[in-house]
Amino acid sequence: MKIGFDNDKYLKMQSEHIRERINQFGNKLYLEFGGKLFDDYHASRVLPGFEPDSKLRMLMQLSDQAEIVIVISAADIDKNKVRGDLGITYDEDVLRLMEVFTERGLYVGSVCITQYSGQESADAFKKRLEKLGIKVYVLYLIPGYPNNTSFIVSDEGYGKNDYIETTRPLVVITAPGPGSGKMATCLSQLYHEYKRGVKAGYAKFETFPIWNIPLKHPVNLAYEAATADLNDVNMIDPFHLDAYGVTTVNYNRDVEIFPVVQAMFEKIMGECPYKSPTDMGVNMAGNCIIDDEVCQEASRQEIIRRYYKGMDALIAGTGTEEEVYKIELLLKQAHAALKDRKVVPASLELEKAAGAPAAAMELDDGRVITGKTSDLLGASSALLLNVLKELAGIDHAVHAVSYTHLRAHETLAISYA
C-alpha cells in the first residue's frame, strides 16, 4: 500500500497543539471529541498511513493531563438507539467505551446523561451505572435550545444542570454517536466553571472535513459521501474569511450554529475567544499529508465504495434515493468513475460471461480474484474459496472442497434454515 499520511508526525503535532490550547485557557480545556476515537476506518481509508486508533494513541500521549466524560442522550436511551456499525445500543456502547479507555490507561471520570426530561429508561441506566461505582451527572432538556441564549445561559438554563466534577486540565467529551449533546455539555460546564471563577476554555476536535485543504479536494468530498445520510455539506467558512481573509473549509452545521455559539460564549465569558468555527478546531491532519495524490486516489476509491454501500442500503430499504444521487454528484466532482475501482469491471465482466451474479476482490498486492454463482455456491462463497486458493498457491482447477461435502452442507443448511 502506498502511504500518503505521516502517522507519527500526526501523533506528535496533534498532541502538541492540544497542549497549546490547554495553556491558552489557563490550564482547563473542554475538548469536544467528534468522530470515532479508536476505530476510525474511514480516516484510514482516505488517508493511507493513518492508523484506525491514531486518535486514541494521541490521547494516550496526554493521559497524565486528560480525563474522559462520556455523554449519552436520554432520548437515545429511551428509544434504544443502535450503533449501525456495531449493532449494539448506545447505552451498552457507553460501557464498552469505558472498558476500552480504561484498558488503554485513560481515565474515565464520569458519564453524563443529556436532554433529560424524566425518562424512566434514563433513570434505570443511571442507577445501573451508579451500582457499578460510576459517577453520573444529568443535563436537562432546556426549552428554546439552542436559540434562546438569554434563557439558556442563566440559572434557569445551564444553571439547573449538574456541575460535572473534573480534576484534570483536559476534559475530553465524547459519545457513542452524533446528536448526543457533546457541545451542550461543554458549554454548560463553561457556565458553571465561570460561576466558580475558573476561566476554562472550549475547543473542538473533528478530523473531517480537513480545514486547510481545498473545498472540493477528494478527501473532503469523501467525508460528504460518508455523511450522505445526514446531508452534511462542506462549505467555505465565511466567518474565517471575513476575519482573516483566509479561505478554510468547515461544514454547514458548524457554520450555521456559530452565531448562536458565539452569543453563548459572550454571555458566559464576556467575549467570544473565537472569530470563526475554524478557530474553534484543533485538527492537524491536513499538515500530515505527505503524498497528496495518494490521498486523492484513496478518497476517490472511498467515494465509489460509498456509492455501492448506498445502493445496497437503498435495495435493503434502509437508504434513500437522495443519498445515492448525492454520492453520484460527488463522484463527478471528484472526477471518479465506477470502473476506476478494479473489482467493479472484473465482477461485471464475469457476471456477463457466466450469466449469473459474480463478485471480485482486490488483494493487497493488486491481484484481482473473482468468484461466480454456481449450483452449489453463491458468488461471495466462491470468491472466498478462490482467494484462499490463490493465497495458498493451489491451482484454481483443483476443488478445495469436494462436491459431496458441499452438497451435504447445502442440504443441512436448507433443512435447518
For the regions a language model picked out, list residue spans one by one.
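Conserved glycine(s) of the Walker
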Residues: 180-181
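Short beta-strand scaffold segments in enzyme catalytic cores
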Residues: 358-362
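Flexible phosphate-sensing "switch/lid" loops adjacent to ATP/NTP-binding sites
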Residues: 1-172, 189-341, 346-348, 363-365, ...
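Short, small/polar residue-rich loop motifs at catalytic or cofactor-binding pockets
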Residues: 353-357
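A short, polar/charged loop-to-alpha-helix boundary motif
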Residues: 377-392
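A short acidic/small-residue loop/turn micro-motif
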Residues: 375-378, 416
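Conserved small/polar residues in nucleotide/adenosyl-binding loops
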Residues: 404-413
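Hydrophobic positions on the alpha1 helix immediately C-terminal to the Walker A/P-loop
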Residues: 185
